[in-house]
Amino acid sequence: MAPKRKSGVSKCETKCTKACPRPAPVPKLLIKGGMEVLDLVTGPDSVTEIEAFLNPRMGQPPTPESLTEGGQYYGWSRGINLATSDTEDSPENNTLPTWSMAKLQLPMLNEDLTCDTLQMWEAVSVKTEVVGSGSLLDVHGFNKPTDTVNTKVISTPVEGSQYHVFAVGGEPLDLQGLVTDARTKYKEEGVVTIKTITKKDMVNKDQVLNPISKAKLDKDGMYPVEIWHPDPAKNENTRYFGNYTGGTTTPPVLQFTNTLTTVLLDENGVGPLCKGEGLYLSCVDIMGRRVTRNYDVHHWRGLPRYFKITLRKRWVKNPYPMASLISSLFNNMLPQVQGQPMEGENTQVEEVRVYDGTEPVPGDPDMTRYVDRFGKTKTVFPGN
């Protein structure tokens, strides 16, 4: 007799007698840019687009405008002066390309700052491109000729090292200082150097990453590109993009289109939040160098950059309690004074007494009592 086939149902299997309980839903907390993000703001006026441009700051300021008194160098640097030795390198300010930056003041969203939630502008995307690359086709100017023997040649076009960076954020761009040679003597006026920030001469650590050599891009045309670089350890509320191509005779390579959109959202779907209704734009676009025909002087060439930023409104939790706002208001009303030290290592405070309630008359009125860091009352017994 053939054996019987066992049932396919396992005897060890247990069935749920009732539905499994579901975890209770809780609000998801997301922190970005120092604000607690809540939700988007919907509506017909919840999205805004802003178009702006930044002009290059290659060393020559916008003024004077006269084309015979320095205005002809606007968009260029002045002639680069070389070091005379390893220890004698002092570049002129007008030969140093610097960062371009601007702050756009956005429409105010909150009339009542006492609410638990506030509206903020959030940068969602940007369309950007360098403007004027066709001007680099000029080969009939008074530049160094491509052949010094044959006279029927063209002028050498702009070529060499190229550097392109742009940034969009709700706060100024954070910068990290780093130089090629810490012995370089930059001018102390007209530009912001590492010495300007640290109040000390540069050291060997400034040739690598020195944690104290940091700054914020708060001035246009003041931060040299060869000194200050985007800080990857910061810039939580800023998005920056860039590339560098080196070489002495590298031809410029540039793509441009009005169809490319760069998304500014992070992995959590949140873009830079504009604190105080301020949007910050920064950029550097160095196309290379030209060499003049008569003196073989090199000039950096920069081009402007166009921005089209899309912003939307977002609800955030109010990070500023009313108590702190009122306290800050009263503190700012008081005059700022500079007196003798009453805090720190050189404090001149002798003794502080705090009374709370009543107690029996102590037999030793000079005994020392204090509250330690754990909140416990301590009594110091007199020594011999």
Curated annotation (Swiss-Prot):
Keyword flag Metal-binding: no
Q: Where is this motif: Bipartite nuclear localization signal?
A: 4-18
Q: Where in the cell is it found?
A: Virion; Host nucleus
Transmembrane annotation, as ranges: none
User: Which Pfam families does the annotation name?
Assistant: Polyoma_coat
Domain remarks: A DNA-binding domain overlapping a bipartite nuclear localization signal is present in the N-terminal region of the protein and is required for efficient virus formation. The intrinsically disordered C-terminal arm interacts with neighboring pentamers. The unstructured nature of this region allows to make different interactions depending on the structural context: pentamers present at the 12 icosahedral fivefold axes bind five pentamers, whereas pentamers present at the 60 icosahedral six-fold axes interact with six pentamers.
The name this protein carries in UniProt is Major capsid protein VP1
Source organism of this protein record: Murine polyomavirus (strain A3) (MPyV)
- Give the classification, highest ranks: Viruses, Monodnaviria, Shotokuvirae, Cossaviricota, Papovaviricetes
